[in-house]
Amino acid sequence: MSIEILIIDDNADIRNIINDLIIDAGFKTRLAANYNQALNEIDKKLPDVAIIDV
């Protein structure tokens, strides 16, 4: 079973850097740029972990 991480950050560059690092570490990721996208991703499937830029 692979851990799935939801990355939520409005800055695309930062979001993609974090995404690349996490994928390289062997985890699955999903991305969201804002609150609405994050809720849509959570509604699809609850992630194991969320990294949130506040």
Where are the regions a protein language model picked out?
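Non-catalytic signal-transmission and effector/linker regions of two-component phosphorelay proteins
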Residues: 1-6, 25
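Conserved acidic carboxylate
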Residues: 9
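Two-component/phosphorelay signaling modules centered on CheY-like receiver
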Residues: 12-30
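Residues in flexible loops and secondary-structure boundaries
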Residues: 16, 25, 39-40, 50
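Acidic, metal-coordinating helix/loop segments flanking the phosphotransfer/catalytic sites
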Residues: 31-49
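Active-site residues of response regulator receiver
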Residues: 53
